[in-house]
Amino acid sequence: MTYQDYILRQIQQAGQAWARIVRLIKDRQFETARMVLDQAYRQLIGLTSGAVLERDTNGLIARLRFDEAPAAGRDKCLALATLLRASGDTAAAQGDSVTAADTYHKALLVLLDTVLRDPSLALPDYAPTVESLDAELWAHALPVTTRQELLLYYEQAGFYAKAEDMLWAMLQAAPGDCAIVGAGRALYARLQHLSDAALIAGNLPRDEVDGGLADLDAYAGEHGC
C-alpha cells in the first residue's frame, strides 16, 4: 500500500465511522458510538477523543498537516471535521448541549481553515458543511474571530447577505470596535465592485449594499471610528 493509499483509507474510515455513528445514535447506543469515535480519532490523529476535544484547534490542524502534501493534509482535516461533527451529534443526542456546541465549534474552525485555504474544494458527501455547522451554533455566542472567518467564507462563496449578517453580528458582539468597522468598509467596497447580477445572486441587491454602507458610516460616526 502506498502512502497516498494509506491516507485515502484513513479518510474513507472517517466517513464510514460517521455513517455508523449516525445509526448508533438513532438506536441510542451511545457507549458504542463513543468507542467507534475513539478508535477513529486514534487512527487519524493518534489521540483519544477526549484529548482531541481538549486540544487547541490550531494545534490539531498543525499536527495533521505537518510534513504532509497539501492535498493529504487537507483530506485529513476534512476527516477530523467529520469526526468532530459526529462527536457533537453524539453529545447533542444525549442532551449535553455544552459539549455539543464546543465540539461543533471546533469542527467549524477546522472546516473553515480547510475551505478558506482551498476555495474551489468540493466537499465529500460525508463531510459537514460550513452552513450546517453554523446552523447548529445559531443560538450560541461565537467568538469574533470565528465570525470573521465566517464572513470571509460567505463572501468567498457568494453568500453576500450572510457575509453582511456576520459583519453586524461582530459589531453587536464587540460594540465600537473600529477594526471591525474598517473590515466592514472594506467588505462593502468589494461588494460595490461586483455586478448587479452577482449581488442579486448573493441575496444582497445593490441598494442594500449602499444602504448597509450608509448604516455603517453612521455607526462609525456614533462610535468615533
Each language-model region and where it sits:
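N-terminal alpha-helical interaction modules that lie
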Residues: 1-97, 101-120, 157-174, 194-225
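Long amphipathic alpha-helical scaffold regions
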Residues: 177-195
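Generic helix N-cap/helix-start motif at coil->alpha-helix transitions
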Residues: 10-13, 80, 140-147, 180
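Alpha-helical adaptor scaffolds
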Residues: 109-159, 172
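Short alpha-helical linear motifs
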Residues: 57-62, 125-129, 188-191
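Alpha-solenoid helical repeat scaffolds
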Residues: 52, 119, 125-126, 181-183
